[in-house]
Design a protein with these regions (language model features):
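Short beta-strand segments
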Residues: 74-76, 140-142, 165-169, 207-209, ...
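Acidic/His- and Gly-rich active-site-bordering loop/insert found
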Residues: 3-103
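Active-site-adjacent substrate-binding region
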Residues: 219, 226-228, 233-249, 401-444
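Active-site metal-coordination/substrate-binding segment of hydrolases
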Residues: 65-147, 152-163, 203, 318, ...
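Substrate-recognition/cap regions that form aromatic- and gly/pro-loop-enriched pockets
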Residues: 341-430
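Midchain, well-structured core segments that form catalytic/ion-binding scaffolds
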Residues: 23, 95, 103-106, 146-147, ...
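His/Asp/Glu-rich mid-to-C-terminal helical/loop segments that flank catalytic regions of hydrolases
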Residues: 224-241, 268-273, 318-325, 332-333, ...
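Zn-dependent metallopeptidase/amidohydrolase metal-coordination segment
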Residues: 12, 336, 343-358, 422-474
């Protein structure tokens, strides 16, 4: 028996363990959708799947609670599939290898899926438990949140109805979120005709790894290094001083994760090899100094490899490296009226160059529409000047905070009564689905909260066990004390 099954509350953790056994990376949700539909039938609640792939449950009010405001419980079913470079794991087939480490639940070499698996299993536990007190409940478990909030965007009017939305996708217990940033994807592409490499040159594979990475909204203001940006600094110098040519570039693999690793293959004249190898060591030390106390495990190495036949033409190489080097990345500015809360940022998430094609993906976030457009226009200019075709997609507005929210007032009072302290009220610099769902179901009073998770979207992701009990107890109390209509 897995040790997770003995954790409290057991009815939550048993469902989480079941979830870890079912592959559910974004874009491959058939198995989890079937599982959730079957679960709904087994526990006797109305359940169905809509055209966007979302799963919906409906549970009637407890007798005597019919006069309470109707609540929508909301979470997303997909997870970010990230693994360490040397971890053997197929996210479309393999279960997540979970284990308990003190007060934390972790995975071995992969993302854990507590984002947003903990929200899903809290919903499952509530749907299953016939002893709870609550008003009319609807559960909305959305599809493909991590890759573009496609389930939320595909939700049609009339599919779900309610007066209160409790989003269970926040990651710090004791915090209530009343607003979030909007976002927009930018993709720059280019096709080019490759040139032959110089047969006298030497090929080197240069690898950067060991960075912390993280969620490109929540952790963008923490000062974590971006692997693509560091590699651009290296490339800029070896092109200028060592006659380096570029064969390929692979950095990052998720639009909403700060890239932790990057690998390029370059060619240089034989006379420059030792200088380049020495410079690799110098770069590692410089970056360790620059990111002291933030990035403790930077590894920057180079090794000789077989000489490829083809490479990126010189002019294209220069344009691409210059654009990546100049591309705005990280925090643009903080919200002037809310201390320490990022307003606008962007993440140079993915760079793929090789075999005659280049593709670069950036995700920009902002709680202010004008600043989101400003930042993405600057990024678009960088890549347009490099001769790339640039497309924007998936734009969504933020969720405007309402400090006078009735459910906010009720939940603050409930939390204080339960735990003897007042929860923090915040705005999050990440894309929650609340704003999108709120546009489909007008008039919703919305709050987002959840248990404590650390390092989501990375193999270091972990979930704090004691916080899960507090989160679940608070959720049950919120449902029991939902305001009357």
């Amino acid at each position: 028996m897995n040790e997770i099954l003995s954790l409290a509350p057991q009815n939550v953790w048993k469902h989480f363990y079941s979830l870890t056994q079912i592959p559910r990376p974004s874009g491959h949700l058939e198995k989890i959708q079937a599982f959730l539909l079957e679960f709904g039938k087994q526990v006797g609640v109305e359940s169905f799947q809509d055209e966007a792939g979302n799963i919906i449950y409906r549970k009637p009010a407890t007798p005597g609670m019919e006069d309470r405001k109707s609540v929508i419980l909301q979470a997303h079913m997909d997870m970010v599939p990230q693994k360490d470079k040397h971890t053997q794991h197929d996210f479309e087939k393999d279960p997540i290898p979970v284990y308990v480490d003190g007060e934390w639940v972790k995975a071995k070499g992969t993302t854990l899926g507590s984002d947003n698996g903990m929200g899903v299993v809290a919903i499952m536990a509530i749907m299953e438990d016939k002893t709870l007190k609550h008003g009319p409940l609807t559960a909305l478990i959305t599809a493909d949140e991590e890759t573009g909030m496609y389930g939320a965007f595909g939700l049609k009017q009339g599919t779900v109805e309610g007066e209160i939305l409790l989003n269970l996708d926040s990651e710090e217990e004791g915090e209530l979120y009343i607003g979030c940033a909007g976002g927009e994807d930018l993709t720059a592409t280019l096709e080019y005709k490759e040139e032959e490499t110089d047969p006298e040159d030497v090929a080197l594979k240069v690898t950067l790894k060991g960075l912390r990475g993280g969620h490109s909204g929540i952790q963008i203001g923490w000062g974590h290094a971006n692997a693509n940006k560091l590699m651009a600094r290296f490339m800029n110098q070896v092109i200028a001083y060592d006659e380096a040519c570029l064969v390929s570039w692979e950095g990052g693999n998720m639009r909403n994760a700060i890239p932790r690793e990057c690998e390029v293959v370059i060619t240089v004249p034989a006379s420059e090899v030792e200088d380049v190898l020495a410079f690799v060591g110098e770069c590692e030390q410089v970056w360790r100094d620059e990111f002291a106390t933030i990035e403790d495990n930077i590894s920057f190495t180079a090794e000789r490899v077989d000489l490829p036949k083809m490479m990126v033409p010189e002019e294209i190489r220069d344009n691409l490296v210059d654009a990546i080097y100049a591309c705005p990345n990280g925090v643009e500015r903080f919200i002037p009226t809310i201390p320490d809360t990022v307003e606008t940022s962007s993440n140079l998430a993915i760079v793929e160059i090789g075999n005659g094609k280049a593709a670069i993906k950036v995700l920009t976030r902002s709680s202010r529409e004008s600043m989101k457009d400003y930042r993405n226009t600057a990024i678009e200019s960088c890549f347009s000047m490099a001769g790339m075709h640039v497309e924007r997609s998936g734009s969504y507005s933020g969720w405007e905070p309402d400090v006078n929210s009735p459910i906010l007032h009720a939940m603050k009072e409930s939390y204080k009564a339960q735990f003897g302290e007042t929860p923090e009220v915040k705005v999050i610099h990440a894309g929650l689905e609340c704003g999108i769902i709120g546009a489909v179901v007008p008039g919703l009073d919305m709050i987002s909260f959840g248990p404590t998770l650390q390092c989501p979207h990375t193999p270091e992701e972990r979930c704090h066990v004691p916080s899960v009990k507090k989160f679940y107890d608070f959720l049950l109390a919120t449902l029991e004390n939902t305001p009357r209509k």
